[in-house]
């Protein structure tokens, strides 16, 4: 990688660490009022993500084009826009149920990230082709884990604002998937894997 690319990646890691610190502070303030386990589970997932971003192994195939960089920044720091206001948000179903949904999403994330290991990162890159475990079902299982966790959070903190934020987030996530696959398809092994595993995001659906 060039010096400029190294600086950009380091800056993104610092921003990610700063963002999760800000989010953790807000979650803690929210927990003192609502005692919502769901929010704590969501925080645990974000901490896991940032930890893996920081320790991700370097690669020369990362995509530093402006569009994937911007999509990654906006999608990775969505929690700056999430509302945790217990006075305006609506709890649609009990916290015990939404916590269960969020835990299921977090467990799936961990399951997928164990298989991916240090090949995880914020920007699209071709590090290692993984085709075992959850990657046998869908090509982007980590995103699916995020989605399930976020659905648990939304059912516990429902508002039109949060719906809008998450809709925007998953439009960006889908854009990231497309750019990630453009980079990964440089590898013939990944092109063969893509032919075998038809579903990108949700098992047997999408």
Model-derived features with residue positions:
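Solvent-exposed interhelical
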Residues: 127-145
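Membrane-anchoring alpha-helices and their flanking helix-loop junctions
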Residues: 1-123, 152-206
């Amino acid at each position: 990688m060039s010096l400029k690319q190294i600086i950009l990646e380091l800056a993104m890691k610092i921003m990610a660490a700063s963002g999760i610190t800000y989010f953790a502070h807000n979650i803690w303030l929210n927990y003192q009022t609502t005692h919502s386990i769901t929010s704590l589970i969501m925080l645990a997932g974000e901490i896991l993500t940032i930890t893996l971003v920081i320790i991700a192994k370097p690669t020369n195939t990362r995509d530093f084009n402006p569009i994937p960089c911007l999509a990654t920044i906006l999608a990775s720091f969505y929690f700056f826009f999430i509302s945790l206001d217990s006075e305006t948000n609506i709890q649609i179903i009990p916290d015990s149920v939404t916590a269960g949904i969020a835990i299921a999403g977090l467990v799936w994330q961990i399951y997928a990230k164990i298989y991916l290991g240090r090949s995880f990162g914020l920007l699209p890159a071709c590090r290692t082709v993984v085709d075992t475990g959850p990657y046998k079902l869908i090509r982007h299982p980590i995103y699916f884990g995020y989605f399930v966790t976020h659905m648990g959070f939304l059912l516990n903190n429902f508002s039109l604002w949060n719906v809008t934020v998450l809709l925007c987030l998953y439009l960006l996530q889908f854009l990231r998937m497309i750019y990630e696959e453009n980079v990964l398809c440089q590898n013939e092994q990944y092109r063969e894997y893509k032919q075998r595993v038809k579903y990108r995001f949700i098992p047997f659906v999408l």
